[in-house]
């Protein structure tokens, strides 16, 4: 696909040597004050399922069986989480994952940012980190499914609807 070739050639996402946590500098400029948020990006696959469930609940997602969530996480190629550290406590404030055939294709799933942290650019950070890691693995096609109200967000990050007329198809049991 021509689009993806141009997208990745023109992408300004740079590789970095990431350890387990990478500190983000996040400014919250609401209410005429600037507040620094102590947020860390992690690619650690050990996610607390109950914290993830709380995060998903905070945005109104339908509850999913934890047993199946655990299986989905285990079978994910990449997991990115955002953790706020405050004093001795930590809180999961963002999450996304990708599955892949590890050759050509990957799909991004479960992108979620806690409502208190939306509008700070954290969703963009998570998506860019996923794309960066997938591109380092030489994945050439990255897909995702988006609710209608967030399509414009993904378009701003370079995703396109129906590239070259390609349509997603689904099969559901009857």
Curated annotation (Swiss-Prot):
GO terms for cellular component: chloroplast. InterPro entries: Acyl_CoA_acyltransferase, GNAT_dom, NSI-like. Keywords: Acyltransferase, Chloroplast, Plastid, Transferase. Its EC number is 2.3.1.-. Residues 42-174 form the N-acetyltransferase domain. PROSITE patterns: GNAT (PS51186). Signal peptide: none annotated. Pfam families: Acetyltransf_1 (PF00583). The keyword Nucleotidyltransferase does not apply. The keyword Transferase applies. It is found in: Plastid, Chloroplast. GO terms for molecular function: N-acetyltransferase activity. Belongs to the acetyltransferase family. Ycf52 subfamily. This is Uncharacterized N-acetyltransferase ycf52. The lineage of its organism: Eukaryota, Rhodophyta, Bangiophyceae, Bangiales, Bangiaceae. The gene is ycf52.
């Amino acid at each position: 696909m021509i689009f993806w070739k141009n997208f990745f050639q023109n992408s300004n996402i740079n590789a970095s040597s990431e350890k387990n946590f990478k500190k983000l500098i996040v400014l919250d400029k609401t209410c005429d004050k600037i507040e620094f948020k102590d947020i860390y990006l992690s690619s650690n696959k050990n996610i607390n399922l109950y914290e993830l469930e709380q995060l998903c609940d905070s945005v109104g997602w339908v509850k999913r069986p934890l047993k199946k969530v655990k299986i989905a996480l285990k079978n994910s190629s990449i997991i990115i989480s955002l953790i706020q550290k405050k004093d001795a406590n930590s809180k999961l404030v963002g999450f996304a994952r990708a599955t892949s055939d590890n050759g050509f294709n990957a799909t991004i799933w479960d992108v979620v940012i806690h409502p208190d942290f939306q509008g700070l650019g954290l969703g963009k950070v998570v998506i860019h980190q996923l794309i960066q890691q997938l591109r380092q693995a030489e994945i050439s096609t990255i897909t995702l499914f988006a609710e209608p109200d967030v399509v414009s967000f993904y378009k701003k990050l370079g995703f396109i609807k129906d590239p070259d007329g390609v349509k997603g198809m689904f099969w559901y049991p009857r």
